[in-house]
Amino acid sequence: NMKRTGFFACGDELVQQLYENIIWGQRGNFLDIPTDCNQRDERLGWTGDIQVFARTATINYRADKFLKKWLHDLACEQRENGAITDVVPDLFNWETVGSSAWGDAGVVVPYWVYRTYGDTQVIKDQFESMKKWILFMESKGSERGLFDTHDCHFGDWLSLDAGDEATGGMTDNDLIGSAYLIYSNRLFIEMGKAIGEDMSYFEELYDLSIKAYRKK
């Protein structure tokens, strides 16, 4: 029962059809949880999919209640070490979790709920979960500021530059991991400041991450 809030119209039939497909794709995948696809039996709440779609989702529909409920589930599934599961709900209880871009849904989704609707309550609700995820990434680095020693990254998933049979692209997984540490930490700092939290530790980490990333 989400209210439609975003509309688009243009004179190009193909562009217009693409937009309509996006709307129907969201409608088909926003049933109780944000799923990855509704046309096959898997239908799991893959965190990576909503991470990249959250901004669009919050523009198309009034999706804050839907996403905040799912974020509560995400925090409940989060491992003690801060790793975020690759699917929420975590139906399979996989041992290897915490992939960059997938786990970053725990920061990126609250960010777009906050930015689109001006909702600071989502920051307060998810603050500890977001903090645990940032600290988890920090703990998995060859030096402080990198996220490059974790052994579970999907990387540039389904990119075609590595050939038709490959599931991941040619971009180094650790490069993507460290880039997402920088990205999510920047969003986390902005949100923390919005609710009056002291973010000095994470600002220092952000500066170190930039330097370490450029050096590597």
Set out the residue ranges of the language-model regions.
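Active-site acid/base region of carbohydrate-active enzymes
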Residues: 2-21, 27-28, 34-52, 56-86, ...
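Aromatic/His-enriched, Gly/Pro-containing loop or helix-boundary segments
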Residues: 90-98
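Heptad-repeat amphipathic alpha-helical coiled-coil interaction surface used
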Residues: 114, 182, 188-189, 206
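Structured core elements
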Residues: 85, 182-183
